[in-house]
A protein has these predicted regions:
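Short coil-to-beta-strand transition motifs
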Residues: 60-68
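Short, solvent-exposed loop/turn positions at domain surfaces
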Residues: 34, 40, 57-60, 266
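Short, charged beta-turn/beta-strand-edge "cap" motif at the junction between a beta-strand
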Residues: 51-60, 78
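Buried, small/hydrophobic-residue-enriched core segments of structured protein domains
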Residues: 61, 75-296
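Short, compositionally biased leader-like segments
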Residues: 38-41, 227
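N-terminal, Lys/Arg-enriched amphipathic/low-complexity engagement segments
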Residues: 1-39, 54, 206
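Short, well-structured beta-strand-loop connectors
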Residues: 40-54, 73
Length: 296
């Protein structure tokens, strides 16, 4: 059961570099279940990988700057709710160095501490509720959906091309966090070159229309969550970023962004960074006068 909605404006498989954004922002609402405590002040200089805010309930879970630069604004809304922290990037980037670590030689607790110290733990989601994972929990399994069945969704085989080693290292790290299995879902109509040869994970082949790519659907069919149990889910690009953090010793916020839709002049994949403004991507590439709504 399901439905594939055929929308106009799919992207060509072309990855285009985009000029550096004039500002980058971390938005607490993107991290469901977190009550942010800001740990920087406006005007303060931060390195890429340095904490901008932490979770009040679990202060060991920190949310770090994607770039080095000056904190331009701590935007607040009603009742002083933190709406976003904006960083103006340096011309030359500086990174917090966490040190190269061998995943093979680490135990689960050491891997978790490495993810917490680097800020990568913030990208682990917990089911039920799809909130940021609780570091005190032990998931019964970890799930990665290797395809997105939503309309105009990015093709992971394309965006992850050439990242097989980092993906494998990320899977190796995640496997240390659970006594169960790491599960990867792929679609039968997709060759899934990136995922099918991953070691240390159980690969499952799915068939059918959307929402087959939703990780919740895959959990339901592979290892349903019973009362009192939790599983963790991770986006494939975040798995790669975890792998890079261990093999390079610095956090990587490089992410592909796909600009698609019927009002886009030339739908493309852009090589960008987490938290970047989309202004450089949409400028001159969206039909003028169109009543456009941007959906992320």
């Amino acid at each position: 059961k399901g439905l594939d909605i055929k929308l106009k404006g799919s992207a060509a498989k072309e990855l285009v570099p985009v000029n550096s954004s004039k500002s980058y922002a971390l938005v607490p609402d993107d991290f469901v279940g977190v009550t942010p405590k800001v740990v920087v002040a406006e005007g303060q200089h931060v390195k890429a990988g340095e904490a901008l805010f932490v979770d009040k309930k679990h202060p060991e879970v920190k949310f770090v700057s994607p770039v080095s630069g000056n904190v331009a604004a701590v935007n607040r809304g009603a009742r002083r709710k933190v709406m976003g922290i904006v960083v103006t990037p340096d011309a030359k980037q500086e990174f917090v160095e966490f040190g190269v670590k061998s995943v093979h030689s680490l135990n689960g607790e050491q891997v978790k501490q490495a993810l917490l110290s680097s800020g990568m733990f913030a990208f682990l989601r917990q089911r039920p509720y799809d909130v940021v994972a609780n570091p005190n929990d032990k998931p019964k399994a970890i799930f990665i959906s290797g395809f997105d069945s939503a309309p105009l969704a990015p093709n992971y085989d394309f965006t992850l091309d050439g990242m097989k080693n980092e993906l494998q290292l990320g899977v190796n790290a995640l496997a240390k966090l659970t006594d169960g299995k790491v599960h990867i879902g792929i679609h039968k109509d997709n060759a899934s070159k990136v995922f099918k040869d991953v070691r240390g994970a159980e690969v499952h082949v799915f068939d059918g229309p959307h929402p087959a790519g939703n990780v919740g659907v895959q959990i339901h069919h592979i290892d349903p969550i019973n009362k009192g149990e939790v599983v963790w889910v991770v986006n494939p690009h975040d798995v790669v970023a975890i792998g890079k953090a261990f093999c390079k010793g610095v956090i990587s916020f490089e992410r592909p962004v796909v600009l698609v839709g019927s009002e886009v002049i030339k739908p493309l994949y852009y090589k960008s960074y987490f938290g970047a403004s989309i202004s450089n991507m949409v400028k001159g590439n969206v039909k003028e006068g169109a009543n456009v709504r941007y959906i992320s």
